[in-house]
A protein has these predicted regions:
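Short, low-structural-confidence N-terminal segments
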Residues: 1-60, 293-313
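A C-terminal, polar beta->alpha supersecondary segment
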Residues: 22, 107, 115, 159, ...
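Second-shell loop/turn segments in exported
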Residues: 22-30, 50-55, 59-65, 74-84, ...
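Charged, solvent-exposed helices and adjacent loops that form client-binding or oligomerization surfaces
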Residues: 38-61, 80-158, 170-175
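Alpha-helical transmembrane segments of polytopic integral membrane proteins
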Residues: 71-75, 143, 186
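Structured N-terminal alpha/beta-domain signature
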Residues: 90, 183, 190-194, 203, ...
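Proteostasis/folding factors centered on peptidyl-prolyl cis-trans isomerases
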Residues: 117-169, 195-197, 216-266
Length: 313
């Protein structure tokens, strides 16, 4: 009888328990198992659903691994920047993520009861305990606080350039010369963009990027903001760039330069996130970080997340 009872237990151990415990990510001394990753993805998936947003399960695994690693690196460097997270901040961050912005006060007993009920419902839906839930939010807060700290050095006033984009199929020399001639002669580049761009949204403003500072479009910084007179000059067509996704070519024009404009909130956020990304890229070379992701792990985690989504919705 004992022998027969051990067989199902050993089968459960090898087929159910052990796969969950395999390491998916290691950052210094902290290990994240497949189970941790499934819970992290389900946490963010459920938050997206609560906010009424679509959640792309196909790309979520890689994004979640990267975000887990970044959160852990932020936590590792928190002391260096004097960063801490209090208990009340965890609760506040959670109800903000749920979209409870207005007329909500955690100091009110009634609102606190509503919050507790929402939290219990949320945890039951994704099947994780409160300690794990708090740890996920706590590490994400360290990431956000690090971003704010690094952003302190961003100048409020910066050089901006007014950028246009033209989508083309015909990039023959004769066509480009014709466009260049008209741009040189005009004081209203917007009309030229609308005349030649094949972007179906051009009449609704597509192709008009407006005032752009360095870092707002990092992939094109070298074109607009290179040093030593290497940057694109005003009213000069750039070389054509291939947009493979839309099967068109893109050319860029700078219409004007302002040496001191105040950063918009949107551009500040983009630049801030870029600085944080650079920080993580630099520090990831210094910390012991290992990914345990192969095809079998990828498929296993996706299957578990999909099953959890079906049964917990």
């Amino acid at each position: 009888f004992i022998l027969f009872s051990l067989i199902p237990l050993s089968s459960y151990f090898f087929n159910v328990w052990m796969p969950y415990q395999k390491i998916a990510l290691k950052v210094e001394n902290t290990e994240f198992t497949r189970k941790d990753l499934v819970e992290f993805i389900r946490f963010n998936q459920r938050l997206s659903e609560e906010q009424g947003n679509q959640f792309d399960l196909g790309s979520s695994l890689f994004q979640s691994l990267q975000l887990l690693a970044e959160n852990e690196i932020a936590f590792l460097y928190a002391t260096e920047f004097g960063l801490t997270v209090d208990e009340w901040e965890i609760d506040e961050a959670f109800f903000l993520k749920l979209g409870l912005y207005n007329n909500f006060n955690l100091e009110s007993e009634e609102d606190e009861e509503v919050f507790k009920e929402r939290k219990i419902q949320f945890l039951n839906q994704i099947q994780i305990d409160e300690n794990k839930f708090k740890e996920i939010i706590r590490k994400s807060l360290f990431r956000e606080k690090l971003r704010r700290e690094l952003s302190r050095e961003i100048p409020t006033l910066q050089q901006h350039k007014y950028i246009y984009e033209i989508a083309l199929e015909d990039i023959s020399t004769s066509n480009l010369n014709k466009i260049q001639k008209e741009i040189t002669a005009t004081s209203n580049i917007s009309d030229i963009v609308k005349k030649y761009s094949i972007d179906p949204e051009v009449m609704r403003g597509a192709g008009d990027f407006g005032w752009i500072p360095k870092g707002a479009k990092p992939d094109l910084d070298y074109l607009f903001f290179s040093e030593n007179n290497q940057a694109l000059r005003p009213k000069e067509l750039s070389e054509p760039f291939i947009d493979q996704e839309n099967s068109v070519f893109k050319i860029y024009i700078i219409s004007d330069v302002n040496e001191s404009l105040e950063l918009s909130e949107e551009n500040f956020e983009i630049i801030s996130e870029g600085i944080l990304t650079n920080f993580f890229n630099e520090k990831s070379q210094l910390v012991d970080m290992q990914y345990g992701l192969d095809n079998e792990t990828f498929n296993w985690i996706n299957d578990k997340v999909q099953v959890a989504s079906i049964f917990n919705n």
